[in-house]
Structures are given as structure tokens and as C-alpha cells.
A protein has these predicted regions:
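Short catalytic/metal-binding and nucleic-acid-binding patches
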Residues: 1-214
Length: 214
């Protein structure tokens, strides 16, 4: 049972819409990207999220921001029952992957929570009005394919010529509660991660009905 269902939830500075903090100024839905039905972001969903900075502005990415990001990701993990096996913070956008662990996990709520509390750390910059998402299909969730998705994310700094190797970039990692030093570039990471994931995942996490993704 999550914190929200226990009645221990405390409100964020703004109310939540699906994946969007309602205190964001632009709420004209004609400007929003279409999303899959909500159930695709609930339960055992696996989603690659990309949060871009408005006008691709830079100058906010620091060790202090990174620490704040990790702290808020831990709170999101506790609230919504998610693991983040990989994230990478870039100078003008953020990548993260969330994997649901419980039937009541809701990544839409998690993303609204994260954006609401993280955006003040960007000041004076702001996020674009909506995060982009890619819900992984079944074939993308198979272990070898999934690790390939995460590797692609970690390669972003190399592709952008910000680092020669992924491990030279200081703003990437994983957020698995209780394991602060776990990092997806460690040699033994994936066997350890899958063991932790299997232990944390509720047996009913996948008992949610969704039409197939085309």
C-alpha cells in the first residue's frame, strides 16, 4: 500500500494534472502532446521520460541541482512505487526511466510531483509545458533490449561531445531506494538491479488491463 492510499499524502505547491503541475502557467490543452490512456502509465508500466527546458536554456545543471534531483526522485519512488534504473541529466534536458512496482503505481502522478518540486531548482529557467514520454512495448522490456535502451540514454553526453566515455559524465545514475551508490555503468549492475527489482515488485503489479501498443 502506497503513502497516498494510506491517507498520508501531503499536497504539492500546485494541484496535479496528468504528468503536469497545474501551477504551470500554460494550461491550454491544444498545445499538449497526446498521451496514451492513463493505464499505460500505471501498475508495472515502464516509461522513458524526457523533460526539456523551455527554449533549451542552459546554465542550471550543477552538482547542487543533481543532488536535489536525486532527493526528489527518492520521494517520487516512495510515493508512487517506482525504480529508476537509469537517468541522465543533459545541459538542456533530462532523461529518466521509471519502472512501476505496484498495482497503484502511477507515473503520471509521479511526473507531476517531480516537475512541481524540481522546477524551482531550475530558476530562473522553467521546464517546457509537458514532458515527452515513450511507453516501452513488451519487446523493448526484455532484459537485453531494455539494457540497450538504458545504454542509449547514458550515451547522450558522448553523442553531444560533452564526454569521451559515458562514465566521464557526472550527471547520470540510477535511483533505487536503499542503494545510493548503485550506477548503471557498474560491471555488475544489471544482475544486481534485476534481483532488487524482482524482490521489490508486487505480485499484482501487472494486473492492469491495457490494449496493445501499436
Amino acid at each position: 500500500m502506497g503513502l497516498r492510499t494510506m491517507g498520508l499524502d501531503s499536497p504539492a505547491p500546485g494541484a496535479y494534472a496528468f504528468g503536469v503541475a497545474v501551477n504551470e502557467p500554460n494550461l491550454n490543452r491544444t498545445f499538449y502532446l497526446p498521451r496514451l490512456p492513463r493505464e499505460f502509465y500505471q501498475g508495472d508500466a515502464v516509461v522513458h521520460w524526457t523533460l526539456s527546458i523551455s527554449h533549451r536554456r542552459r546554465g542550471w545543471l550543477t552538482e547542487r541541482f543533481h543532488a536535489s534531483f536525486r532527493e526528489l526522485m527518492l520521494h517520487a519512488a516512495a510515493r508512487e512505487g517506482v525504480f529508476c534504473p537509469t537517468y541522465c541529466l543533459m545541459p538542456d534536458h533530462l532523461h529518466l526511466v521509471w519502472m512501476g512496482l505496484r498495482l497503484d503505481s502511477d507515473q503520471g502522478n509521479g511526473m507531476a510531483f517531480l516537475r512541481t518540486y524540481l522546477e524551482p531548482k531550475l530558476a530562473p529557467q522553467k521546464f517546457q509545458h509537458q514532458a515527452h514520454d515513450h511507453v516501452l512495448k513488451e519487446k523493448e522490456r526484455r532484459r537485453n533490449a531494455f539494457s540497450g535502451v538504458c545504454h542509449y540514454i547514458l550515451e547522450n553526453p558522448v553523442q553531444a561531445e560533452l564526454a569521451k566515455e559515458p562514465d566521464e559524465w557526472p550527471f547520470s545514475g540510477a535511483v533505487v531506494p536503499g542503494y545510493p551508490t548503485l550506477h548503471p555503468l557498474q560491471k555488475d549492475y544489471w544482475p544486481k538491479f534485476w534481483k532488487l527489482f524482482a524482490a521489490a515488485r508486487s505480485p499484482d503489479a501487472g494486473k492492469i488491463i491495457r490494449p496493445p501498443i501499436r
